[in-house]
Amino acid sequence: MLKDYGTLFAGEPEQSAAEALARRVKHIAEFVAQSAVQPAMAPAAESQHRVTYHSSCHLRAAGVTKEPRAILKKLPGVEYVEMPDADRCAGGAGTYLVKDFDTSQRIVARKREAVESSGATLVATSCPACMIQLKTGLPPDVEVKHIAQVLQESYEAARRRAGETAS
C-alpha cells in the first residue's frame, strides 16, 4: 500500500519524497470519515441492512480500523453489528487462496461462522482479495461489498430521493 511507500526507499535519495507521499495518501474510508463535508446519504434499500465489517489485513496493518466502522455506523438504513474476530484474516491474502486452497477454505469457514453469528446480511470490506474469498466462502444470501460500493449506493439513493421530492 502507498502508506508504506517511504520504507521502499529507505536510505535512498528518494526516501524523503516517498515519505511525504505516504503521509498524504488516504484510504477512502479515512477521507470520508475525516472530511468536514458530508454528502447527503439515504438508505440504499427499502429494508434495513444488518451490516458487519471485515478488516482486511493490509488496511489493519496501515492503522485504518476505526474509520470504516464509523462510516457504516452513520449510514441511514444500516444496523451495524461487529462480528466476532472481525480482524481475523479471511484466507484470501492476495494469491494465498490459490497457493494453499485447502488452508484458505478452513480459514474462510471460521469467518463464515463469525458472519453467521453476527446475523449480518451484508459484509463490507476494503480489500478486493477479501471480497473474492468472502463471496465464495459465505452463504449466497449474505452480500459482500467494498465499503466504497456501500457509500456510493447511499449517496445515489439520496440523490434519487432528492430528485423525487423536487418533482
Placement of each model-derived feature along the sequence:
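Iron-sulfur cluster-binding electron-transfer modules in prokaryotic oxidoreductases
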Residues: 1-167
